């Protein structure tokens, strides 16, 4: 079933809105993401933090399922003890909601830094914030401090990396399936190699074989 939820803006140029359209399709079951978020929330509790503002592709994908392509715009995932909200640009329309576990807010380009206003709407001001110091630029950190006015902030990137290193049964199953797909591509490349063949034709043989195997498996 497809449902569309597009909040009617209170003004002609809203700072953000929710565009929840279509059926959700995620790489893993909801229980997998719930377990990952439980681990992140434990990290926050142990560090005395109220919320995590994640900005990297790997952490946003790990905790929500959504893998963004920035198109020059910032993306985020805000996690508190009760909420998990992806923050995305309007260029993606309803895709981030369809591809994420949790809520999604779309920010607009009508006013500079609406991205941070959307994050603020989830965290609130004056909270203790965890962020990724190995991904967030100094300029972005300055904007975070300006808009969120955190009581304190701490780098949680090392803790999230340690969590990601511990693979679940579902992750191991997907890794094994991916390796099997790569085997199919490798054999196709081996069979395609012969004197005089172009490199691009060899590469295409491997790609085509893997695409067919992916379609068959997933």
Regions found by a protein language model. Name each.
Residues 1-185:
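A composition/biophysics-driven feature that prefers long, compositionally simple stretches
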Residues 43, 192, 209-213:
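Short alpha-helical functional segments enriched in proximate histidine and acidic residues
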Residues 136-138, 198-205, 209, 214:
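Short, structural beta-strand-to-alpha-helix junction motif
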Residues 179-189, 199-201, 207:
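Active-site pocket-lining segments that scaffold enzyme catalytic pockets across diverse folds
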Residues 193-197:
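Short, contiguous acidic and Ser/Thr-rich linear segments
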Residues 216-218:
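Flexible, glycine/charged-enriched surface loops at secondary-structure junctions
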